[in-house]
Amino acid sequence: MSTNQQESDGATRVAYILGMPLAENVVRQWPQMGEIVRTSRLVADVEGNFPELTLEVGRRLQLDDVVVVEWTCDYGDGRLYRNVTIGELEDGQAVRVTDYWGEPTVTPEWRQPLTDRLDMPGDGIWPNREHLSHY
Protein backbone atom coordinates (compact mmCIF):
# COMPACT_ATOMS: atom_id res chain seq x y z
CA MET A 1 0.00 0.00 0.00
CA SER A 2 1.19 3.47 -0.78
CA THR A 3 1.66 6.04 1.95
CA ASN A 4 1.07 8.69 -0.71
CA GLN A 5 -2.66 8.31 -1.30
CA GLN A 6 -3.90 9.96 -4.48
CA GLU A 7 -7.04 12.08 -4.34
CA SER A 8 -9.83 10.21 -6.09
CA ASP A 9 -11.67 11.75 -9.02
CA GLY A 10 -14.59 9.39 -8.38
CA ALA A 11 -13.58 6.95 -11.12
CA THR A 12 -12.81 3.46 -9.95
CA ARG A 13 -10.82 0.52 -11.21
CA VAL A 14 -13.66 -1.79 -10.27
CA ALA A 15 -15.97 0.09 -12.67
CA TYR A 16 -13.41 -0.63 -15.40
CA ILE A 17 -13.18 -4.26 -14.30
CA LEU A 18 -16.96 -4.70 -14.34
CA GLY A 19 -17.40 -2.70 -17.55
CA MET A 20 -20.10 -0.53 -16.00
CA PRO A 21 -20.51 2.29 -13.49
CA LEU A 22 -20.98 1.85 -9.78
CA ALA A 23 -24.16 3.00 -8.10
CA GLU A 24 -23.51 5.80 -5.62
CA ASN A 25 -24.64 3.50 -2.78
CA VAL A 26 -22.62 0.48 -3.98
CA VAL A 27 -21.41 -2.07 -1.42
CA ARG A 28 -18.05 -3.74 -2.14
CA GLN A 29 -16.94 -6.71 -0.07
CA TRP A 30 -13.77 -8.76 0.33
CA PRO A 31 -14.78 -12.02 2.08
CA GLN A 32 -11.21 -13.27 2.56
CA MET A 33 -10.50 -10.21 4.74
CA GLY A 34 -13.96 -9.86 6.26
CA GLU A 35 -14.21 -6.27 4.98
CA ILE A 36 -16.95 -4.20 3.41
CA VAL A 37 -16.86 -0.67 2.02
CA ARG A 38 -19.96 1.38 1.25
CA THR A 39 -20.46 4.08 -1.42
CA SER A 40 -18.64 4.64 -4.68
CA ARG A 41 -16.69 7.51 -3.12
CA LEU A 42 -15.21 5.29 -0.40
CA VAL A 43 -14.46 2.56 -2.97
CA ALA A 44 -12.48 5.16 -4.95
CA ASP A 45 -10.72 6.33 -1.77
CA VAL A 46 -9.62 2.75 -0.97
CA GLU A 47 -8.37 2.24 -4.53
CA GLY A 48 -6.42 5.52 -4.33
CA ASN A 49 -4.05 3.86 -1.86
CA PHE A 50 -2.62 1.63 -4.60
CA PRO A 51 -1.27 3.92 -7.35
CA GLU A 52 1.29 1.31 -8.45
CA LEU A 53 -1.40 -1.28 -9.22
CA THR A 54 -1.71 -2.42 -12.83
CA LEU A 55 -4.44 -4.73 -14.08
CA GLU A 56 -6.24 -6.19 -17.04
CA VAL A 57 -9.50 -8.02 -17.59
CA GLY A 58 -9.22 -11.48 -19.09
CA ARG A 59 -12.88 -12.41 -19.38
CA ARG A 60 -16.17 -10.73 -18.53
CA LEU A 61 -19.46 -12.69 -18.50
CA GLN A 62 -22.82 -10.98 -18.02
CA LEU A 63 -26.08 -12.78 -17.30
CA ASP A 64 -29.09 -10.55 -16.75
CA ASP A 65 -28.34 -8.70 -13.50
CA VAL A 66 -24.96 -10.31 -12.69
CA VAL A 67 -21.52 -9.84 -14.21
CA VAL A 68 -18.57 -12.13 -13.41
CA VAL A 69 -15.05 -11.01 -14.31
CA GLU A 70 -11.73 -12.87 -14.30
CA TRP A 71 -8.80 -10.47 -14.12
CA THR A 72 -5.13 -10.16 -13.20
CA CYS A 73 -3.28 -7.48 -11.25
CA ASP A 74 0.19 -6.60 -9.97
CA TYR A 75 0.39 -4.35 -6.91
CA GLY A 76 3.82 -3.20 -8.04
CA ASP A 77 5.80 -5.98 -6.38
CA GLY A 78 6.02 -8.18 -9.49
CA ARG A 79 3.61 -10.86 -8.25
CA LEU A 80 0.55 -11.56 -10.41
CA TYR A 81 -2.72 -11.96 -8.52
CA ARG A 82 -5.50 -13.86 -10.31
CA ASN A 83 -8.90 -12.52 -9.29
CA VAL A 84 -12.64 -12.98 -9.73
CA THR A 85 -15.09 -10.14 -9.22
CA ILE A 86 -18.87 -10.56 -9.13
CA GLY A 87 -21.09 -7.55 -9.68
CA GLU A 88 -24.80 -7.48 -8.92
CA LEU A 89 -26.59 -4.95 -11.12
CA GLU A 90 -29.61 -2.68 -10.96
CA ASP A 91 -30.51 -0.26 -13.75
CA GLY A 92 -27.14 -0.74 -15.47
CA GLN A 93 -25.09 0.02 -12.36
CA ALA A 94 -23.26 -2.23 -9.92
CA VAL A 95 -24.93 -2.14 -6.49
CA ARG A 96 -22.98 -4.97 -4.85
CA VAL A 97 -19.48 -6.13 -5.73
CA THR A 98 -17.68 -9.14 -4.28
CA ASP A 99 -13.96 -9.66 -4.95
CA TYR A 100 -12.08 -12.93 -4.53
CA TRP A 101 -8.33 -13.29 -4.87
CA GLY A 102 -5.42 -14.90 -3.23
CA GLU A 103 -1.69 -14.51 -3.12
CA PRO A 104 0.19 -16.34 -5.84
CA THR A 105 1.50 -19.69 -4.67
CA VAL A 106 3.47 -22.64 -6.02
CA THR A 107 1.90 -26.07 -6.49
CA PRO A 108 2.85 -28.24 -3.49
CA GLU A 109 5.26 -31.03 -4.37
CA TRP A 110 2.82 -33.77 -3.29
CA ARG A 111 0.18 -32.48 -5.75
CA GLN A 112 2.44 -32.07 -8.80
CA PRO A 113 2.04 -35.68 -10.03
CA LEU A 114 -1.75 -35.34 -9.73
CA THR A 115 -2.16 -32.14 -11.77
CA ASP A 116 -1.18 -30.56 -15.07
CA ARG A 117 -0.11 -26.97 -15.63
CA LEU A 118 -2.87 -24.54 -16.59
CA ASP A 119 -2.26 -23.04 -20.04
CA MET A 120 -2.11 -19.30 -19.38
CA PRO A 121 -1.08 -17.39 -22.53
CA GLY A 122 -0.06 -13.83 -21.66
CA ASP A 123 -2.77 -12.28 -23.80
CA GLY A 124 -5.51 -14.67 -22.63
CA ILE A 125 -7.93 -14.83 -19.71
CA TRP A 126 -5.06 -14.55 -17.22
CA PRO A 127 -2.87 -11.76 -18.68
CA ASN A 128 0.85 -11.65 -17.98
CA ARG A 129 2.71 -8.61 -16.65
CA GLU A 130 3.29 -7.21 -20.17
CA HIS A 131 -0.46 -6.96 -20.75
CA LEU A 132 -1.36 -5.04 -17.55
CA SER A 133 -2.09 -1.29 -17.48
CA HIS A 134 -2.94 1.48 -15.01
CA TYR A 135 -6.66 2.36 -14.75
Where are the regions a protein language model picked out?
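C-terminal and inter-domain tail/linker signature
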Residues: M1-Y135
